[in-house]
Amino acid sequence: MASDVRGRRKTKIGVVVSSKMEKTVVVRVERVYSHPQYAKVVRDSSKYYAHNELDVKEGDTVRIQETRPLSKTKRWRVVGRVN
């Protein structure tokens, strides 16, 4: 029932680049796509602040999920590690 109420939340997979804050990590998500006009393969990355209760470390590959705003910049939470 709870999953119906929350709806479908966005998920992303990325690498933890910083874990120096308490219960917060910075996750870099890379996206590779072909440019629509020039057909060149482009690599783009974004950094997300995510709530960390699983004690993940720098260099870990993790899955993050969209959640309610937890602070000024945190809108994601770590769901689990990806191996």
UniProtKB/Swiss-Prot annotation:
UniProt name for this protein: Small ribosomal subunit protein uS17
Gene symbol of the encoding locus: rpsQ
Subunit record text: Part of the 30S ribosomal subunit.
Source organism (scientific name): Chlamydia trachomatis serovar D (strain ATCC VR-885 / DSM 19411 / UW-3/Cx)
Recorded family membership: Belongs to the universal ribosomal protein uS17 family.
NCBIfam families: PRK05610.1 (NF004123), uS17_bact (TIGR03635)
Family matches, as PROSITE patterns: RIBOSOMAL_S17
CDD domains in alphabetical order: Ribosomal_uS17
GO cellular component, one term: cytosolic small ribosomal subunit
